[in-house]
């Protein structure tokens, strides 16, 4: 198993523990430390970040992304107790200007909705991605979500209790 290695970078690793199953977009393991990176298509402005509303809470349009990352972080903690987990959202940075012309020509959407990527000779795809993508540390917000009760009909419940309740209902094909 790749996660038994001391250092590894995995793309879309599947992690299952009990009734919980997740696929993390990118997972970087270094000893007992993890970087959980969720890649989102929603754009982000690194010059004028707008993740939080006027009153300091996570904006409603961003909340599902944070909650998804929080759930994945929680499951990863269950699978690797005592580990250190930093959680990131990676999003296109609309404050950046592409350093080459015709970047849109590098991506083609196929009839089955898959995306085909063609990187021309001489173009460093990794450097291009690092320039155009923002890796935003959301660890403090994820920790706040995990420490706060989840409001739902029948709730509120602590995050872990709500997750276990929903997993039980899902496993038994019962409504929540």
Question: Which residues are covered by each model-predicted region?
Answer:
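Mg2+/Mn2+-dependent nuclease catalytic core
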Residues: 6-152
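Cysteine-cluster motifs in flexible loop/terminal segments that predominantly coordinate metals
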Residues: 153, 157-176
